[in-house]
C-alpha cells in the first residue's frame, strides 16, 4: 500500500479460481490479457488485490502454475489473512481483531460429530478458519445445525458455503467482505481512499465483496448458482453490479470498460503495426515490446521485415543487451538473431510476460524500467530480474528508443526454456 503517495486511481479486488484464473483456458489468454493491461496502464497508480479462499500454501502453488501478476495485497483463507507485497508481510492488526470471541479448538470439537462434514486437507486449516467438504444436498441442514451448536457455545462464528462443496467456519468478523472493509478503512485513515474500487467474483464466498458500500462489482459469466441467487435476492437493482457475458479475467476487463473506470484495451488485443501513441507512456512501451516478442516467436504476427524494422526503430543503434549469463551483445545484433527465431515456439504453449514493473524517471526525457520478465513453455518457466532504459527521441519513428537492457536470473528460475531471453 505504501507504493502510492496518494489515492489509487483504481483498486481491483478479485477472487482467483474461476474469476481471475480460468482453469478451462489452457493458454491462459484472458489472464495474460489482464496482466498486460494492468502493467501497461495501471501498475503505477492503482492497487491490485487478490482475495481468495485458498490458504497461503495453495495460493503459492497456483502462482507457480499460472502466469499471474504479483498483487499489492493478498487476502487469503476466505478473508482471514491479509498480507502485503511480494514478501507477503502479514497484517498483525487484522489477526488480533479476529481473535475476539473465537476459539478454534471449540469449533473442531463441536463439529466432529457431524458425519456429513469431511475435513479439508491440513494445508487449508488455518488459525481463523476450519474448512470442510459437504455434499450439496446436505449443506443447508448441516449449516443450520452447526450454527446453533456454536451459538450455544458462546462463539461468534460465521459459516460460508461456496463452490457447491466447500464449507468454511470463520470468526464472525472475518470474510472477504470484512477484510475489504478493513482495508478501505485503513486506506482512508492514511488519507488514501481509492478513487474507484472494482470487486470481482464467481462463487458464494465472494458475495460479501459486493455488499461493501460504494464499490463497483462484476460477477463473471461463469458465476456459480449460489452467487447468482444472492444477486437476485440482494442486488439485482444495484446499477453498480453487473453480470458479465465474458468468462473470468475477460469479464473483469469488460467491467473496467462498462463502468468507465479507465482504459480496457489490452496490449495483447492490439494488431501490429501499432498506432503511434499521442503521448509516451514508458510502462506501455515495455509491455508492448515483450508482447510483440512473444507473438513473433509464436508466429502470431506476419513473418515480415516490418516487425524487425519496428524493433530496430525503437532500439538505439549503439544500445546493448546483457543476457542473464553475462553475455553482452548489441541490441541490433540481438534483433537480427531474433529474425531466425520466427515461429520457433509455435504450438508449444510458450508465453512471455512482464510482472512487478516499476518506472523511475532519470531525466526530463529518460526513464529506467525494472521488472520481472517471465518466459514459460508448457509447465516449465524461467525468470530474469530485468532493467530497461528508454529515452525520448523525436526523430525516431515511434518517438522513443530503448538504449540498454540488462537481465539477471531470479533464484530458482534460471533454466528450462530453450532459447529464452533473446531480447
Swiss-Prot record:
GO terms for biological process: sucrose biosynthetic process. It catalyses: sucrose 6(F)-phosphate + H2O = sucrose + phosphate. Its cofactor is Mg(2+). The keyword RNA-binding does not apply. SUPFAM superfamilies: HAD-like, NTF2-like. CDD domains: HAD_SPP. Transmembrane segments: none annotated. It comes from the Eukaryota. It is an enzyme of class 3 (hydrolase). One of its GO terms (molecular function) is sucrose-phosphate phosphatase activity. Belongs to the sucrose phosphatase family. Homodimer. Catalyzes the final step of sucrose synthesis. Inactive with fructose 6-phosphate as substrate. This is Sucrose-phosphatase 1.
Amino acid at each position: 500500500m505504501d507504493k502510492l503517495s496518494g489515492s489509487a486511481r483504481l483498486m481491483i479486488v478479485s477472487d482467483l479460481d474461476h474469476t481471475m484464473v480460468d482453469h478451462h483456458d489452457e493458454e491462459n489468454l484472458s489472464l495474460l490479457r489482464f496482466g498486460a493491461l494492468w502493467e501497461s496502464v495501471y501498475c503505477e497508480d492503482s492497487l491490485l488485490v487478490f482475495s481468495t479462499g485458498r490458504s497461503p500454501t495453495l495460493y503459492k502453488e497456483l502462482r507457480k502454475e499460472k502466469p499471474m501478476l504479483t498483487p499489492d495485497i493478498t487476502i487469503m483463507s476466505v478473508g482471514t489473512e491479509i498480507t502485503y507485497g511480494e514478501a507477503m508481510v502479514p497484517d498483525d492488526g487484522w489477526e488480533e481483531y479476529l481473535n475476539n470471541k473465537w476459539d478454534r479448538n471449540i469449533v473442531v470439537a463441536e463439529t466432529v460429530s457431524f458425519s456429513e462434514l469431511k475435513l479439508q486437507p491440513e494445508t487449508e486449516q488455518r488459525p481463523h478458519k476450519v474448512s470442510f467438504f459437504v455434499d450439496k444436498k446436505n449443506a443447508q441442514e448441516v449449516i443450520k445445525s452447526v450454527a446453533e451448536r456454536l451459538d450455544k457455545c458462546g462463539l461468534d462464528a460465521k459459516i460460508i458455503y461456496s463452490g457447491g462443496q466447500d464449507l468454511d467456519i470463520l470468526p464472525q468478523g472475518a470474510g472477504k467482505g470484512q477484510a475489504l472493509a478493513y482495508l478501505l478503512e485503513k486506506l482512508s485513515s492514511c488519507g488514501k481512499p481509492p478513487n474507484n474500487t472494482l470487486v470481482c467474483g464467481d462463487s458464494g464466498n465472494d458475495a460479501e465483496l459486493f455488499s461493501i458500500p460504494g464499490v463497483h462489482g462484476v460477477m463473471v459469466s461463469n458465476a456459480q448458482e449460489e452467487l447468482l441467487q444472492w444477486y437476485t435476492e440482494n442486488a439485482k437493482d444495484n446499477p453498480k453490479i453487473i453480470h458479465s457475458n465474458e468468462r473470468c479475467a475477460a469479464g473483469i476487463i469488460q467491467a473496467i470498460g462498462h463502468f468507465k473506470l479507465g482504459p480496457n484495451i489490452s496490449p495483447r488485443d492490439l494488431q501490429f503495426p501499432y498506432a503511434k501513441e499521442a503521448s509516451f507512456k514508458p510502462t506501455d512501451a515495455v509491455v508492448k515490446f515483450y508482447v510483440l516478442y512473444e507473438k513473433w516467436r509464436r508466429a502470431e504476427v506476419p513473418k515480415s521485415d516490418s516487425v524487425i524494422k519496428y524493433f530496430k526503430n525503437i532500439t538505439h543503434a549503439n544500445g546493448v543487451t546483457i543476457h542473464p549469463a553475462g553475455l553482452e551483445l548489441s541490441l541490433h545484433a540481438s534483433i537480427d538473431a531474433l529474425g531466425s527465431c520466427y515461429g520457433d515456439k509455435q504450438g508449444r504453449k510458450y508465453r512471455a510476460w512482464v510482472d512487478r514493473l516499476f518506472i523511475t524517471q532519470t531525466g526530463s526525457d529518460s526513464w529506467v524500467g525494472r521488472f520481472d520478465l517471465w518466459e514459460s513453455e508448457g509447465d516449465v518457466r524461467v525468470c530474469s530480474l530485468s532493467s530497461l532504459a528508454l529515452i525520448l527521441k523525436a526523430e525516431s519513428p515511434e518517438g522513443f528508443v530503448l538504449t540498454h537492457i540488462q537481465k539477471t536470473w531470479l533464484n530458482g528460475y534460471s533454466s528450462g526454456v530453450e532459447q529464452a531471453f533473446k531480447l
